[in-house]
UniProtKB/Swiss-Prot annotation:
Family that this chain belongs to: Belongs to the nucleoside phosphorylase PpnP family.
Main function: Catalyzes the phosphorolysis of diverse nucleosides, yielding D-ribose 1-phosphate and the respective free bases. Can use uridine, adenosine, guanosine, cytidine, thymidine, inosine and xanthosine as substrates. Also catalyzes the reverse reactions.
EC assignment: 2.4.2.1, 2.4.2.2
Chain's gene name: ppnP
Protein name as catalogued: Pyrimidine/purine nucleoside phosphorylase
Keywords, comma-separated and alphabetical: Glycosyltransferase, Transferase
UniProt source species: Geotalea daltonii (strain DSM 22248 / JCM 15807 / FRC-32) (Geobacter daltonii)
GO cellular component: cytosol
Length: 104
């Protein structure tokens, strides 16, 4: 899906790591949320409360999910899931466009 209809967009940006990662929150009529954002090259660690699906729209990175020793390469058009109450590390190699879905 390349666009979302009938949504509310929160104007204030979510800014992490001194602007290295930014996003905007989108709220659907069902109450579900996604964020659309950009990551600049760098290394980042995020914690999750609920499970998340990270769709990489463009860019190039490696991800390591907590409890898994190996790093997984992820490129534009690919995705990865992170379980609830976990964390993940990313080595972002190029400017990366992403959509994060917060799973129920």
């Amino acid at each position: 899906m390349s666009e979302f209809s009938n949504v509310t967009v929160v104007k204030e940006a979510n800014i992490f790591f001194d602007g290295g990662v930014t996003s905007r929150t989108i709220i659907f009529s069902s109450g579900s949320k996604k964020t659309l954002g950009i990551m600049m090259p760098g290394e980042y660690v995020f914690n999750t409360a609920g499970a998340e699906l990270m769709e990489i729209l463009s860019g190039d990175l490696e991800v390591q999910i907590a409890g898994i020793d190996s790093w997984k390469p992820v490129k534009g058009g690919e995705s990865f899931e992170v379980p609830a109450s976990s964390s993940f590390r990313m080595k972002v190699k190029t400017v990366t466009d992403y959509c994060c879905s917060f799973l129920a």
